[in-house]
Structure formats: C-alpha cells, structure tokens
C-alpha cells in the first residue's frame, strides 16, 4: 500500500476518478443487453449512441446537484443555463426514452432522476473488479464517489506476490490474478477496470473475457481486441491532454463536438 500522496497526486486521482464515472454509463448499457432491461425507449436501445449515453449521465449528475439544493422542478432551459448545456439537446435526448416533462411545470427533479437511473441501469448495485494494484488502481479503488453512484469496488487483482493479500486504504482486498475467473463467477462482477501496463493489457483483457465479464473500462493506451459481445471503453489521459493542448494553441477555432 503506497504512502502519503502529494497534492498533485490527489488531484490526478480525482480527475481520473471523474473520467471513470463519466464512462461507466455506456458499459452499464452494454451489460443490460444480457440482463434485465430498463424501461423501453421509443426506439431500439441498441441504437442509442455513446454520446447520448454520456449526456444522460451528465443530466443525472446535474439533477443530483439540483435535488441537493432543494429544487423540485426544473425546465430544460433552466437546466441548460445553470449547467452550460443545450436545452434543445436535453429535450431531444429525453424524448427518445419517453415523455417525462409536464406542460407548464417542466421536469420533476426526483422523478426524472429516478427514470434516468433506470435507463442507465443504475437502479441496482453493480460490482466492479480492478485489474492492476499499482498507484492508478489503488487510487481508483479508494474513490468513495463510486459507491454513492451504485458501483461497488469488490476486489483488485494483481500478479505480484508482494501485493496479493494486501488491501487498499479503504479496505479493498487484492487477490492473485489467477483467481479472477472464480471470483467473477462467485461474486457476480459486472465490470472490469484495466489499470495495467500497455504491454500486458491484451493478455489481461483475454483473461477478463474468459472469466465472463462483458464490460471493460481500459486505462491502458492502445486498442484491445475483444469479441463482439464485449464492450470496451478506453480512457487515454494523454489524448485528453493533447486535446487541451490543441485548444490552447488554437482556441479561436477549437469547437466542442458534442
């Protein structure tokens, strides 16, 4: 278990954790294909884009903040203005899944939040396994925000003998990677997070797939090969930094895609 972290390390862990939360919604959507589905959208749920899924996750966070402020209702316009979103896009995204607004009132914050959690598959606790007990894996394991959003970090896995049998600061146990298949089956792990070096990522993802996990969040650079029924989302921090670098260099022409 690592020692004390610097302020920069804490900030990095927080930013990585935010990226983790932002991407999990699409993985939950993939998991729902083989399990219990949320309320049916007006069209085939398999055709919902990843950008739409990500926006629903953003709306959910905004509603959570509004609820904490004591708000009971909100219009798409006020939601957009307060959180720097697009009102027309909000209405379009929500209309895809049904009619949630009330004429003259807008949206009931608590009800819309509940519907979004159902749509995103977050109305039940999901168990997550982290592969790789290095600094990144440990930082993710100890982030308390995951549990608040319904994601339980069930275990970590590593192949270094000195780490096996240890725990993260928050008490997440570290198991031998050889026990992955047995643990996934016994503890119903739904999502795997890869926090391993790029050189071993494909070998590790093969083990994860063989264990029966259908949703994977990959923090290793590069592209992984998986079967068609397995969803992988990559979080490449270097790409994000390069995008910010482009914005700084060309701020007058840089535009957000979504």
Residue ranges and their predicted role:
Residues 62-67, 170-258:
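Phosphate-bearing ligand-interacting subdomains
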Residues 73, 77, 82-127:
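HTH-adjacent hinge/linker in prokaryotic transcriptional regulators
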Residues 149-170:
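NAD(P)-binding Rossmann-fold cofactor-contacting core
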């Amino acid at each position: 278990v690592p020692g004390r972290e610097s302020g920069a390390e804490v900030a990095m862990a927080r930013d990585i954790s935010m990226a983790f939360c932002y991407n999990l919604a699409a993985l939950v959507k993939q998991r729902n294909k083989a399990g219990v589905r949320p309320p049916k959208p007006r069209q085939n749920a398999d055709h919902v884009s990843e950008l739409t899924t990500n926006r629903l996750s953003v709306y959910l966070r905004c509603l959570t903040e509004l609820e904490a402020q004591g708000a009971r209702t909100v219009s798409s316009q006020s939601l957009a203005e307060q959180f720097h979103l697009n009102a027309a896009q909000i209405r379009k995204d929500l209309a895809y899944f049904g009619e949630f607004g009330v004429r003259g009132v807008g949206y009931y914050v608590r009800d819309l939040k509940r519907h979004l959690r159902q749509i995103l598959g977050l109305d039940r606790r999901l168990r997550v396994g982290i592969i790789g007990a290095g600094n990144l894996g440990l930082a993710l394991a100890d982030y308390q925000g995951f549990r608040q959003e319904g994601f339980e970090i069930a275990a970590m896995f590593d192949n270094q003998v000195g780490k096996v049998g240890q725990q993260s600061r928050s008490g997440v146990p570290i198991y031998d990677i050889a026990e992955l298949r047995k643990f996934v089956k016994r503890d119903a792990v739904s999502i795997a997070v890869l926090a391993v070096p790029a050189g071993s990522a494909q070998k590790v993802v093969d083990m994860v797939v063989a264990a029966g996990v259908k949703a994977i969040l990959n923090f290793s650079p590069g592209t992984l090969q998986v079967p068609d029924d397995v969803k992988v989302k990559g979080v490449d921090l270097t790409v994000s930094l390069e995008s910010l670098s482009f914005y700084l260099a060309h701020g007058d022409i840089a535009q957000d895609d979504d």
